[in-house]
């Protein structure tokens, strides 16, 4: 499922807790 890396998104939009980037502060969020 496509997602966008953001620092924050609504809990129900979170797909993965980490974006797989070096910075784990970004989360993978569901795209609108």
Curated annotation (Swiss-Prot):
Keywords linked to the UniProt accession: Antibiotic, Antimicrobial, Defensin, Disulfide bond, Secreted
Q: What is the lineage of its organism?
A: Eukaryota, Metazoa, Chordata, Craniata, Vertebrata
Which segments does the entry list as coiled coil? none
Query: According to its UniProt record, which protein family does this protein belong to?
Result: Belongs to the alpha-defensin family.
Q: Which Cys pairs are S-S linked?
A: 3-29, 5-19, 9-28
Q: Which GO terms describe its cellular component?
A: extracellular region
Cross-referenced InterPro entries: Defensin_RK-1
User: What protein am I looking at?
Assistant: Corticostatin-related peptide RK-1
Indicate the principal place this protein occupies in or around the cell. secreted
Q: What does this protein do?
A: Has antimicrobial activity against E.coli and activates ion channel activity.
